[in-house]
Amino acid sequence: MNRRRSASAAVLLALLLPLPLAAAGTSVAADSPSAAESRRAAVELPRPTGRFSVGQETLHLVDRSRTDPWAQSGPRELMVTMRYPAQRGTGAPVHYLTSEEARLLLIDRGLDKAIPVETLAGTAAHSRSNARPVAGRYPLIVLSPGYTVHRATLTALAEDLASRGYVVAAVDHAYESVGTAFPGGRVLECLACDKTEEGGTPMRAVSDNRGRDVSFLLDRLTGRHPAWRHAGLIDQSRIAMAGHSIGGASAVAAMATDPRIRAGVNMDGGLHTPVPEAGLGGRPFMLLGEQKSGPGGMSSWDRDWPLLDGWKRWITFADSGHFTFSDFPAIAEQLGLPDPEAPLPGTRSVELTRRYVGAFFDQHLKGKPQPLLDGPTPDAPEVRFHTP
């Protein structure tokens, strides 16, 4: 199967294009002037809700002990966006994506004629590059994105967590997105997609490799000679991971082999790497899914739910889709491109994702009890708790 029509790509295309536009043979030129103009307007992610401003720095990490599994030559490489509590009024504005990253993403989704490159690339975020950190010791959260998509797609969640007093490391795994910029003018495309969709490589190879990537990242952030100049901000006793789609499956893979990761969140990812039969050592884990991911809707969750041997929750959002947990609904909403099959508004998608993921980490990394996680609440009627 061509990756441009893979399941994840099809879902994203449905998210960003209303059905009349997605129909074969329909021309984007049929848009009304107001709709077309909206796609050239400035797009802004929802503002973070915490008390801190957010700083941002980018790391390029090279694991010379491993050969890249997709290129099958050269060392394994990662691009990492670090976000952290920062002093107000310091730092400079950041870019959401480079023009080439945005161009490749739009082409892959069949949206290059509908959305200008500069609109997506110029999406306004709220981090500040090289901002001065607020002194302290903060829990570390690793974020891993969905298959084929850039780490920037988790920006709204990452910024909110940093504003609430976390250090956040969002990872791009080489050759696993349709386009990620690396040093030296390189833009690495999705070699992994060809191998998994056309070459017979199982998706478990992706999540297992990402688990190893995360352990290497933790080594470089918490070792004797850390790769990040602000590594002293990290409380090494409080580390967790969350991921979207294959990134969520990778949280299980990482936790299964790395005891440093104290808690995990899987946002609508099939568990290609199963939970070990012995469990996760009693560590807390949350399954957070779209409307169709309740019991009976996600077979690997049904299979592995009994193996989660610590505090656990299985939560879904009504009217949501696979990409609800990323930035895409908020961006699509502002561009006049809602998804009729996942009508949860974009701003509400971001709000709920931030609230429940943030509450999980506040409870399990900061020791702050969160009644929000005990069951349904009147102010969140979209949220379903499942106890199979």
Descriptions of predicted regions:
Residues 131-137, 182-242:
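Gly/Ser-rich "nucleophile elbow"/oxyanion-hole loop immediately N-terminal to the catalytic nucleophile
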Residues 2-30:
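Secretory targeting and sorting signals
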Residues 217-281:
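Primarily recognizes the serine-hydrolase "nucleophile elbow" in alpha/beta-hydrolase
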Residues 122-181, 293-297:
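Short substrate-entry loop that stabilizes the transition state in hydrolases
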Residues 34-141, 342-346:
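Domain-level recognition of soluble alpha/beta enzyme cores
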Residues 32-46, 51-56, 64, 87, ...:
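Alpha/beta-hydrolase-fold serine-hydrolase catalytic core, especially in secreted/extracellular enzymes
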Residues 83-89, 96-110, 152-196, 318:
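Active-site machinery of serine-nucleophile hydrolases
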Residues 262-324:
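The feature captures the conserved acid-bearing segment of alpha/beta-hydrolase catalytic domains
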